[in-house]
Amino acid sequence: MMKLQDFDYQLPQSRIAQSPCAKRDHARMMVLDRRIGSLEHRHFYDFPDFVRKGDVLVINDSKVIPARLSGRKETGSRIELLLLSRYSDSPAVPETDSTEWPFFRVGVEETWEALLKPGKRIRIGTSIFFDDHSRATVIERINEKKWLLTFNTALPFDLFLQRYGKAPLPPYIKREKKNAQMPEDRDRYQTIYARSPGSIAAPTAGFHFSEALFKTLRELEIVIAPVTLHVGFGTFTPIETEDVEDHVMEVESFSISPESSDKINSAERVIAVGTTSTRVLESAADEQGRVHPMSGQSRLFIYPGYRFKRVQALLTNFHLPKSSLFLLACAFAGKDRIQQAYATAIQEEYRFYSYGDCMLII
């Protein structure tokens, strides 16, 4: 059994990026050749130097919704909400083929799973009020962390979120209260190719692509294949088991179109942009490595020992220690290679986590 503690590392707080790079494609990029372990220090605008005709770049086009809300209880005390998924028998996905707002139903109550902070004194029936007199009512406790709430809003729910919701920045982005949310977060905590609303955390490896860089890739005849995985609680929830193998991922909704699967299956090399794209590809691939078009749910947990079926190169950010994302990187490049690369990244003062720099593993 693998011990989770073996995937820990110490990161100085100063290395956690608190804001995005001034220009998307100017982030630093470490290039790791997993065969020989060599490292190269570049910038993301150099990414075209590492691709060639015949490559297919697989991107996750899921769009982050403004899922963080602030309200008050009847006592006047403030409470923070992070919406996780619209409630149904399965994780929330749009009920229409539309990839643009609004994708929520209008004229009916909305029921959502959510995290509440502070959550110690929450009871069934607790009401939470918002600035426009809209209200959410707690109707069920799902488990120690998650609650079920019904919203009655003055506006259609998508417009309510646009007006009052904030970008669901991760908790390690710590700013002074007045700058807790900056105007650019709505734009920068999002990829430029986001199309399908539904994520509550961003597929951050895609942050580094600019329109100019995409133009260069197209000129190089690099094929782009979009897939969708709505990033949910399962991606960022901490692993709490001592043994890695005992961890169970929560389900997340994903889809891959016939057009994208055809592009991927004809690729000479598949480059996955991010761990979420990787999980879509590996969930949709058969044992021969052929990717099939499908829509479904995945709880695929990739950790060292996993045999990759379709991904041949990976672009990813620098991840939290002991996280499922870090374990995926270790599975792809090897635990020792990744730990050595991370130690070098700390020494070379790379920026870590969501708004940080990236690593290309070839």
UniProtKB/Swiss-Prot annotation:
Source organism: Syntrophus aciditrophicus (strain SB)
Similarity comment text for this entry: Belongs to the QueA family.
Database matches in HAMAP family: QueA
Quaternary organization: Monomer.
Function field: Transfers and isomerizes the ribose moiety from AdoMet to the 7-aminomethyl group of 7-deazaguanine (preQ1-tRNA) to give epoxyqueuosine (oQ-tRNA).
Transmembrane segments: none
GO cellular component terms, A-Z: cytoplasm
GO biological process: queuosine biosynthetic process; tRNA wobble guanine modification
Catalytic activity field: 7-aminomethyl-7-carbaguanosine(34) in tRNA + S-adenosyl-L-methionine = epoxyqueuosine(34) in tRNA + adenine + L-methionine + 2 H(+)
Keywords, sorted A to Z: Cytoplasm, Queuosine biosynthesis, S-adenosyl-L-methionine, Transferase
Protein name, as recorded: S-adenosylmethionine:tRNA ribosyltransferase-isomerase
Pathway: tRNA modification; tRNA-queuosine biosynthesis
Localization per record: Cytoplasm
PANTHER family recorded: S-ADENOSYLMETHIONINE:TRNA RIBOSYLTRANSFERASE-ISOMERASE
GO molecular function (one): S-adenosylmethionine:tRNA ribosyltransferase-isomerase activity
Pfam families, alphabetized: Queuosine_synth
